[in-house]
Amino acid sequence: MNNEKNVSFEFIGSTDEVDEIKLLPCAWAGNVCGEKRAYCCSDPGRYCPWQVVCYESSEICSQKCGKMRMNVTKNTI
């Protein structure tokens, strides 16, 4: 048996063009969370320095990302 695990990432999109536009700022790092089929907020070190955060919907992502941006901006070293 081969112990290597094949990991493939897939960019998460939407069939709804309007939703796609709203989703882009949050999910440009979506390939990181492809296996979870979730929407990504950001790359580590951008708005979420400790991790990539994923949410189940673009609406939740937008809300959480907005709060995170403000929190991280206030605490910037």
From Swiss-Prot:
Residues 1-22 form the signal peptide. Transmembrane segments: none annotated. The keyword Metal-binding does not apply. Disulfide bonds join 26-61, 33-48, 40-54, 41-65. The keyword Disulfide bond applies. It comes from the Eukaryota. Keywords: Allergen, Disulfide bond, Signal. This is Pollen allergen Amb p 5a. It comes from Ambrosia psilostachya.
